[in-house]
Amino acid sequence: MAEETPRYAVVTGANRGIGFEICRQLASEGIRVVLTSRDENRGLEAVETLKKELEISDQSLLFHQLDVADPASITSLAEFVKTQFGKLDILVNNAGIGGIITDAEALRAGAGKEGFKWDEIITETYELTEECIKINYYGPKRMCEAFIPLLKLSDSPRIVNVSSSMGQLKNVLNEWAKGILSDAENLTEERIDQVINQLLNDFKEGTVKEKNWAKFMSAYVVSKASLNGYTRVLAKKHPEFRVNAVCPGFVKTDMNFKTGVLSVEEGASSPVRLALLPHQETPSGCFFSRKQVSEF
């Protein structure tokens, strides 16, 4: 019997947490995975850990350094994948940041308790907002743009954008921004840029609170709402692809100081499912809350 054609995946932000676990689950299914991270030493350590644990070869799991905020770094990775594999089947955009400074002790003490006020334990600034948008929105967008030519060579191209239920439109309180992002028919990359630029402008002018962008974590909410919107735009532009955004649930990770309720194994299983579902059974242009299609 002829050996099955190998399938290739790239996972961003993968040296720990959900990204690391996505790599483990994909590699366990025989997918050849490129694990990427900003920190080279941590990334190489992560690859060695998985190779030992899964008893897989150097060909099955590779490392490449990647900073999604740096276009040159993305180009370098795309060249590497082209040279190594000649195509790509699965792109998982997992890298992300919170865009805030958190009082970790207050979070651990109060998370999940009644009357807990997020806005009292976090600090948001223009610089943090800019970085959050750059990594959470423009990072995945540039990754998609760089890898679309290689994904087109796959017989079942997948893009899985790891998002958050915080990016659902009900959490975008600014009516103008919500109006643009909820108008799926007319949504374009340019219109998403308009929303982002307005948020940055309001941060610069100190009017974010009065413009009522979100209850808290405005940068994170808008970055993920924008990523969800871009998922719809991309799915429409490439009907032969399967492009979806997914909230993995409230997972115990370093980002939330391990205050989540789900394990990383449970969290990673939702993006992995979307990466591996048979092509005909996979919808496109959807937002999933874990394994269920949910509203944007």
Swiss-Prot record:
Tell me about pH and activity. Answer: Optimum pH is 9.0 for the forward reaction and 8.0 for the reverse reaction.
User: What are the recorded Gene Ontology BP terms?
Assistant: defense response
Which positions does UniProt annotate for NADP(+) binding?
Answer: 16-40
Return the Gene3D superfamilies for the record: NAD(P)-binding Rossmann-like Domain (3.40.50.720)
One GO location term (cellular component): cytoplasm
**Signal sequence, start to end:** none
Reactions this protein catalyses: (+)-neomenthol + NADP(+) = (1R,4S)-menthone + NADPH + H(+)
- Give the domain of life: Eukaryota
Q: Where in the cell is it found?
A: Cytoplasm
Which CDD domains does this UniProt record tie to the protein?
A: carb_red_PTCR-like_SDR_c
Its EC top class is oxidoreductase
* Record-linked Pfam families: adh_short, adh_short_C2
Active-site residues (renumbered): Y220
Induction (free text): By pathogen infection. Not detected in healthy leaves.
What protein family does this chain belong to? Answer: Belongs to the short-chain dehydrogenases/reductases (SDR) family.
- So what does this one do? Aldehyde reductase that catalyzes the reduction of the aldehyde carbonyl groups on saturated and alpha,beta-unsaturated aldehydes with more than 5 carbons. Involved in basal resistance against pathogens.
State the name under which the record lists this protein: (+)-neomenthol dehydrogenase
Q: Which organism does this record belong to?
A: Arabidopsis thaliana (Mouse-ear cress)
Q: Supply the gene name.
A: SDR1
